Structures are given as structure tokens and as C-alpha cells.
């Protein structure tokens, strides 16, 4: 399986989708820094990292755009290639050299990793950039331009003691869910009519699920709100774990059942 993983990574890092998604995410991050600096240039010396990082900056549309587009950023790099492999006949060729289960494991691993790093890199770059410009001290609770993280919020202890660690915790969480969302494309690839559909379905699912949860359950199981570090909705660690574990088990079961199919296309 290692040769398959190596080759899949080779394909992934040569994918146009990877660089398009990375460029889009980074552009949003840079745009947020520029917008904040231009809006508050007269009082810039009083601002701190947690007011300016895209994850906790609620002043501009860049935060909402990034987290709304997160499934697209996750799926663009490599998630649609399983559909492509089926349609081009590449899957038939690779199954001459490895088992179907081995192929699925390799493909899923690379899809997950590429999705995670594509979402995490812009957030990390933005964090490193604002840390070179603004001090790391924490704003007072409910201070102007502060995200207003309270004791009931997730990772509130980190927010109060070290904003960089708070940001890193959410970046890792975002990377985990980005990987899971990208794997949805792999799960549905055999039942869609185009590579575009395979890439867009995780986004559609993400938006619909989050919208329904916001309307019926105060947003406490809205994935979009759960991944956003500004935390406009209060949720617990247990809810995050349930969503992550539940999503992981469903995807693993789906891929396991696909891998058990007879190696005949």
C-alpha cells in the first residue's frame, strides 16, 4: 500500500485544485489582515492577535466566507479524483497491482491529509502574520472587537491564557473536520454524474446540516458554527467528540463496505 500512497501524494501535489484552494484560502486570510489594518489604522497600536486573526475577527465577511467555503477548500485539492479514477479507467489499472481495500485506504488517507493541510495552512499563515504585527496579550472579556469567549465556550482556558494555543487548537479541529468532509466526496463518487458534483456535495451537506441545526437546535450541532473559533454558538467538548467520532465511524463503515465488494467493476 505504501507505493500507492506515495503515488497518490505525487498526484495530489501536482493537482491544480490543491493550488487553487490554497490560493483562495490564503487570499481570504490576507484580505482579512488588510481590511482590519485599513479600518483601524489610527488605533492599530491598541489591537492584539485575538482581535485580528481571521478565526476570531468578526468585523469583516472574510471569517464567514472562509468557514462557509471550508468544504470546498477541503474537497478541491484531491477529493474528486476517485470519481476521475473511475471514469478514466485508472481504477481498473491500479486494481491489477493492489487490492480494492488497499486502494481505498490509500486514496482516503491522501484525500484526508490534503484536505486538512489545505484548510490549516491559510489559518496558520494568518496567525503567524498577525503575531508578527500585534502583541499576543489577551483582550479583556467583552472588550470591543473581542470574540467574547466565556467560561462556557470550548477551549476557554486556552483563550484566557494563550491565544496562540487557542488558535492552534481550532486549526487542528478545522483540519480534522475538513478531512472528514472531503471523504464524503469519496463516498458518493460512484453515485454522481460529474467530478463537480462529487466536490460540491460535501459543501451542500455542510450548509444544509448547519442551517437545519441552527433552526431546530440553537446551532449546538451546526458543524459550521462548531468549527468557527469566534464561537457565536455555545457547544461542549462532548458535542464536538460526538460529531467527530460519529462522522468518522460512518465514513469508515462506508469505505469498509466498498472495499469488501468483489474486485470487478
PLM regions with names:
Residues 15-17, 21-24, 178, 228-265:
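Alpha-helical transmembrane segments of multi-pass membrane transporters/translocases
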Residues 16-17, 99-101, 105, 194-199:
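Membrane-helix interface segments
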Residues 1-25:
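Aromatic- and glycine-rich beta-strand/loop motifs that create alpha-glucan
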Residues 134-149, 204-220:
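Juxtamembrane non-transmembrane "cap" segments at the membrane-aqueous interface
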Residues 21-26, 196-209:
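Central hydrophobic cores of alpha-helical transmembrane segments
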Residues 27-80, 109-182, 186, 226-246:
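Secretory targeting signals
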Residues 193-197, 203-204, 260-265:
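Short cytosolic juxtamembrane segments of multi-pass membrane proteins
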Residues 81-113:
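Helix-loop-helix units of permease transmembrane domains in multi-pass membrane transporters
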Amino acid at each position: 500500500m505504501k507505493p500507492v500512497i506515495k503515488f497518490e501524494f505525487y498526484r495530489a501535489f501536482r493537482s491544480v485544485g490543491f493550488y487553487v484552494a490554497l490560493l483562495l484560502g490564503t487570499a481570504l486570510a490576507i484580505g482579512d489582515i488588510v481590511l482590519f489594518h485599513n479600518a483601524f489604522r489610527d488605533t492599530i497600536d491598541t489591537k492584539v492577535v485575538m482581535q485580528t486573526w481571521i478565526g476570531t475577527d468578526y468585523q469583516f465577511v472574510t471569517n464567514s466566507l472562509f468557514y462557509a467555503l471550508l468544504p470546498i477548500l477541503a474537497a478541491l485539492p484531491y477529493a474528486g479524483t476517485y470519481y476521475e479514477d473511475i471514469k478514466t479507467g485508472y481504477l481498473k489499472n491500479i486494481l491489477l497491482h493492489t487490492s480494492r481495500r488497499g486502494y481505498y485506504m490509500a486514496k482516503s488517507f491522501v484525500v484526508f491529509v490534503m484536505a486538512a493541510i489545505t484548510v490549516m495552512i491559510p489559518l496558520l499563515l494568518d496567525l503567524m502574520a498577525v503575531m508578527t504585527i500585534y502583541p499576543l496579550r489577551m483582550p479583556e472579556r467583552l472588550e470591543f472587537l473581542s470574540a467574547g469567549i466565556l467560561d462556557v465556550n470550548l477551549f476557554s482556558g486556552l483563550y484566557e491564557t494563550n491565544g496562540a494555543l487557542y488558535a492552534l487548537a481550532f486549526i487542528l479541529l478545522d483540519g480534522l473536520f475538513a478531512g472528514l468532509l472531503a471523504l464524503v466526496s469519496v463516498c458518493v463518487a460512484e453515485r454522481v454524474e460529474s467530478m463537480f458534483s462529487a466536490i460540491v456535495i460535501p459543501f451542500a451537506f455542510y450548509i444544509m446540516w448547519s442551517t437545519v441545526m441552527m433552526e431546530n437546535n440553537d446551532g449546538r450541532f451546526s458543524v459550521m458554527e462548531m468549527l468557527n473559533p469566534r464561537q457565536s454558538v455555545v457547544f461542549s467538548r462532548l458535542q464536538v467528540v460526538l460529531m467527530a467520532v460519529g462522522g468518522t465511524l460512518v465514513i469508515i463503515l462506508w469505505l469498509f463496505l466498498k472495499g469488501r465488494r468483489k474486485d470487478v467493476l
